[in-house]
Amino acid sequence: MLKKRGGNIVTKKVLIAADSSCDMPEEYIQKHGIKILPFNININNVNYLDRKEITTTQLFEKVEQTHQLPKTSAISPGTYLQFFEKYASEYDIVFIGLGSDFSSSVNSAILASKEFKNVYVVDSLNLSAGSGLLINKAVLLREQGLSALEICEELKNIIPRVRVQFVINTLKYLHMGGRCSGTSRIFGTALKIKPIIKVVDGKMVVAKKPMGYHRGLQALLHMLEEDKDNIDGDLMTITHCLADSDAVYLKEEISKMVDHKNILETNAGAVISTHCGPRCIGILYILKENK
């Protein structure tokens, strides 16, 4: 049996960490001292570290050049073990990972964490900035003086209130990756369907099937409007893959609809873009806690 490592869980500083699928801006990551573990992206049998060795623009340039769809591979237990060993002597660690239905990576993190007394792994049951919203909550809870264990428990209570919905411009990537139930029924249709994908209970599902991209954006706004009186004020994100002008449009429309002071535009990294394709865009937020 492996001996657990790590020190007292009460007196240490809290380190917040995540994988590269969280899609939070580098400026935010640096400001709050977040540690990021990169996924591997494979294109035409060449491996790249997400966020470090390949950008989203470069990803699709390589797809055009090679005519090969990219593949992602989970972060290994050994990589997590090395990371936790590096920081667990100085920090209590809260690690927030890509939802377990989308990758085995977070399960590898859980496996590695079992060797330590002071490493807490959170399965976000989400993706992209949906995980990023949880990172932001963890930062705020750390600022309030909560311990790593307390932060972990609070995040687990928040997870069911995270809302992630995005419009897909091309079904090719999502369908080939087999990541969303229901896409096979509409893939290849002559209609210009741009499905709205939601994350429900940790899984991606097709929520609506608008015809045309602009109608897809309107559907996103309509879904937001239904929640507008119950949105947590800490942070909302507009996350997209090479859809800058659409992000500007959505931010303008959202500002007319809700009085939210913290709307952050984020760019989808290579992990999310690999499965969702160019011009995918979403609105992500957390609902208020029912009192």
Where are each of the predicted segments found?
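Mixed-charge interfacial surface used for oligomerization/domain docking
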Residues: K4, I9-K13, S20-K35, N40, ...
